[in-house]
Amino acid sequence: MAHKKAGGSSRNGRDSAGKRLGIKAYGGERVIPGNIIARQRGTTWHPGLNVGMGTDHTLFAKVEGHVEFRAKANGRTFVSVLPIAVAAAE
């Protein structure tokens, strides 16, 4: 009888789920303490005033206010939270 030799298994078939990285609160948006502003791998965005950075480089608000993105001359983008009183005065 004719038999077919066993075929090798495919080496494909792996795909990981997306990690939902990126900006979660855009410039001008109101945030409260603890709100996540951005999830990232490495420091695409750097923490500025009233913004903290977690161990996984997540940026979060330390005070209530409005988010502001500002690019510096060295090419780095800093994310700050302007407190409500300061944001209203500007």
UniProtKB/Swiss-Prot annotation:
GO terms for molecular function: structural constituent of ribosome. InterPro entries: Ribosomal_bL27, Ribosomal_bL27_CS. Residues 1-20 are annotated as: Disordered. Signal peptide: none annotated. Keywords: Ribonucleoprotein, Ribosomal protein. The keyword Ribonucleoprotein applies. SUPFAM superfamilies: Ribosomal L27 protein-like (SSF110324). One of its GO terms (cellular component) is cytosolic large ribosomal subunit. PANTHER family: LARGE RIBOSOMAL SUBUNIT PROTEIN BL27M, RIBOSOMAL PROTEIN L27. Belongs to the bacterial ribosomal protein bL27 family. This is Large ribosomal subunit protein bL27. It comes from Rhodopseudomonas palustris (strain BisB18).
